[in-house]
Amino acid sequence: MVSLRMHELPVNDQPRERLARLGAGALSDAELLAILLRVGISGTNVLQLAQQLLGEYGGWIGLQVADYNDLCRRTGIGASKAATIKAALEIGRRLARSSVEERYPIRSPGDVAALLMVEMSHLDQEHLRTVLLDTKHRVQQINTVYIGSLNSATIRIGEVFKEAVRRNSAAIIVVHNHPSGEATPSPEDIQVTRQLVAAGRLLDIEVLDHLIIGRGQYVSLRERGIGFE
């Protein structure tokens, strides 16, 4: 079967024209990515290139966490296209986060997971983040406190609460990921949780929960009654 070059497709079937006519929501993932890429390479039109990229990287999430330099080296991409992809995905990530941060209170562990799981479940190192909340449990700020192997010996309690004290936060939620993809709490996770809960009581900043994020899954230690006895 002979594949058509992009300019050989009927005008109404080309991604930009379809977007103008039907709106961005009507486009497939490959069509949206093709608009960012703009042009293909010899023998592969831009829509085919977009389909290949999404397949190779496992969709948008894979492209979001992909190394920029690796993308640059991919045939048909290069620095300019890689930068465009990364910038567009970062805009989407910030938009998704800001809509939750600015408008909605956190009511459940699922709300926090929805805010952070897509990004954190694919990190290749452990990250510990704090979600700072006001008196109505609206998100004030999200901070990355630590990157790397986390245990009770390396975590300084003061660092975890530093921004919460500065922002006069009413509560925090602690979130960290397991790069292995398994969200089961370790003994170290439980010990750290107990230390943080105790420190929060002294500082009058409630630790509402500690979430562990794995690959497409999360565990709420509060829901399991672990570390919050």
UniProtKB/Swiss-Prot annotation:
Q: Where is the MPN domain?
A: 105-227
Q: Keyword rRNA-binding: yes or no? A: no
Indicate which residues the UniProt annotation says bind Zn(2+): 176, 178, 189
Q: Which residues cross the membrane?
A: none
Disulphide-bonded residues? none
Look up the record and give one Gene Ontology term from the biological process aspect: proteolysis
Residue positions of motif JAMM motif: 176-189
Molecular-function GO terms, alphabetical: metal ion binding; metallopeptidase activity
PROSITE patterns of this UniProt entry? MPN, UPF0758
What the entry lists under CDD domains is as follows: MPN_DUF2466
| Alphabetized UniProt keyword annotations | Hydrolase, Metal-binding, Metalloprotease, Protease, Zinc
Task: Give the family per the record.
Answer: Belongs to the UPF0758 family.
Q: Which PANTHER family match?
A: DNA REPAIR PROTEIN RADC, UPF0758 PROTEIN YEES-RELATED
Q: What is this protein called?
A: UPF0758 protein Cagg_0777
- Native source organism of the sequence: Chloroflexus aggregans (strain MD-66 / DSM 9485)
